[in-house]
Amino acid sequence: MHIELTEMLRCPEPHREEMLVLSTGEVKDRMVRSGLVGCPVCHKEYSIARGIVNFRRNKERVSKDSSGPRPAYTPPSPLPSADAAKLQALLELSGPGGYVVLVGSAVRQAARLSALMEGIHFVGINAPTEMEEQPSLSLLYANEKVPLRTAIARGVVVGADLATSPWLVEAHRVLLRGRRFVVENEEPELPIGLVKLAAENGLWVGEKR
């Protein structure tokens, strides 16, 4: 986890948002490899191991047997690697800085997107188990709530495997107003507050009001 992301984290428990407290173990090139983040409100602690912050109650990575929302839709053709440039265009980001949140299988796009969008840090939520952190990618695992503060992301992409209502609501919450919201599902069950821009080729694209 990039050390500066600490300021954007929130405890997933149902209480007011408050900045978490970081206790570092190993830090390498501004990436926290081990340590803890603690909540000053409910006093829960969440471990950081191999650079990954685990907010899950069962302390495991995402698996077929894990709790939380499960896939409800598989697009006719998932976004291929060659379409990273298209995804960049859909996000409509100009200039470096800030965070883009990738949820579920969309985290696989991080390496290709970072090559196209220099200076932006990507935050992967419940990434596929083979994924590892990168200098431009921090990984977080959680049960049902994205462990990020409200309205901090310049863009959000939700993968088909987690394109279900609870995760879409959370992805909407962390997105800044006026920014793009992309889902690998042409007909997602979307929260209110999004303006539809397009829906084709297995993707839904909108903007937060």
Report each predicted region and the residues it spans.
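Class I SAM-dependent methyltransferase Rossmann-like catalytic core
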Residues: 2-5, 24-29, 41, 49-97
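Residues immediately within or flanking Cys/His clusters that coordinate Zn2+
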Residues: 8, 36
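Short cysteine-rich clusters marking metal-coordination/redox-active sites
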Residues: 11-14, 39
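Conserved class I S-adenosyl-L-methionine
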Residues: 89-122
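A short acidic, Gly/Pro-enriched loop at the edge of an enzyme's catalytic core
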Residues: 97-98, 134-160, 166-170
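Short, polar loop motifs at secondary-structure junctions
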Residues: 105-109, 123-131, 185-188
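A short glycine-rich, Lys/Arg-flanked "PGG" loop and its adjoining helix->strand segment in the class I
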Residues: 165-181, 186-187
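Core SAM-dependent methyltransferase catalytic element
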Residues: 189-209
